[in-house]
């Protein structure tokens, strides 16, 4: 036994007036913390202490646990919640019928008539000169069969093109662009006009040469 620890069984005698202070000093007989019976513990009385003071009611029981506590009984549920649970169970059991969307042709046609122009409105729409295609006598460049209409030229445009063809049978791209800007035509229109004019010129030259040959032959026959 170590001399540093005081044996609690050994009687301790103190002077008069100091015996009341003895109960307030914790004396230990061994290395374990074992307070005297007069010293109150912070977590309730121990098994060997005096039970003069009752334990507080808010301390948890010694052997109780949170998982072992009995469930609280709140009494029967009100009628409102019981009816609500029954209605939810019935609604969950019944499955809604499948939804089959039907096309609404009348609405589609109505939307087209509202946001788009109908055939009658297109026909009745006035066509102003600035809305027409440049250098075209017809309001539309396509015929009733869907083919592109024949391009017509004014007298001034035809005269200028004939002058240019008289000097040059074939045009360079630079010259073709200049003529197109001067006559307010496209480069493609100038190119097509010259192609057609060359075909016509070849045909006329063939007819002219054939007529000259026939005339020469007629002149040679009487001479024979």
From Swiss-Prot:
Intervals of motif Antp-type hexapeptide: 127-132
CDD domains membership: homeodomain (cd00086)
DNA-binding residues: 146-205
Pfam families, per the entry: Homeodomain (PF00046)
Keyword flag Transcription: yes
Keywords associated with the record: Developmental protein, DNA-binding, Homeobox, Nucleus, Phosphoprotein, Transcription, Transcription regulation
An example molecular function term from Gene Ontology annotations: sequence-specific double-stranded DNA binding
Domain of life assignment: Eukaryota
Subcellular location: Nucleus
GO term, biological process aspect, one: anterior/posterior pattern specification
SUPFAM superfamilies: Homeodomain-like (SSF46689)
Any one annotated GO CC term: nucleus
Main location: nucleus
Phosphoserine sites (modified residues): 214
Family affiliation: Belongs to the Antp homeobox family.
Biological role: Sequence-specific transcription factor which is part of a developmental regulatory system that provides cells with specific positional identities on the anterior-posterior axis.
The protein's name in its UniProt record: Homeobox protein Hox-B6
Species assigned in the record: Mus musculus (Mouse)
Protein's gene: Hoxb6
């Amino acid at each position: 036994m170590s001399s540093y620890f005081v044996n609690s069984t050994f009687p301790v005698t103190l002077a008069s007036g100091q015996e009341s202070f003895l109960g307030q000093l914790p004396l230990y007989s061994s290395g374990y913390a074992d307070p005297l019976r007069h010293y109150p513990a912070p977590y309730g009385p121990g098994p060997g202490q005096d039970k003069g003071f009752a334990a507080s009611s808010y301390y948890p029981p010694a052997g109780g646990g949170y998982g072992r506590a009995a469930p609280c009984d709140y009494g029967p549920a009100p009628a409102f919640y019981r009816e609500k649970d029954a209605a939810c169970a019935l609604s969950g059991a019944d499955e809604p019928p499948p939804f089959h969307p039907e096309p609404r042709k009348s609405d589609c046609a109505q939307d087209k008539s509202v946001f788009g122009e109908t055939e009658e409105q297109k026909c009745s729409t006035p066509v102003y000169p600035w809305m027409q295609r440049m250098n075209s006598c017809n309001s539309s460049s396509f015929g009733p069969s869907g083919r592109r209409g024949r391009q017509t030229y004014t007298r001034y445009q035809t005269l200028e093109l004939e002058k240019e063809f008289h000097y040059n049978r074939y045009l360079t791209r630079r010259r073709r662009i200049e003529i197109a800007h001067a006559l307010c035509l496209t480069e493609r229109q100038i190119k097509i006009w010259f192609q057609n004019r060359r075909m016509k010129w070849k045909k006329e030259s063939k007819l002219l040469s054939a007529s000259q040959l026939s005339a020469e032959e007629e002149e040679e026959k009487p001479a024979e």
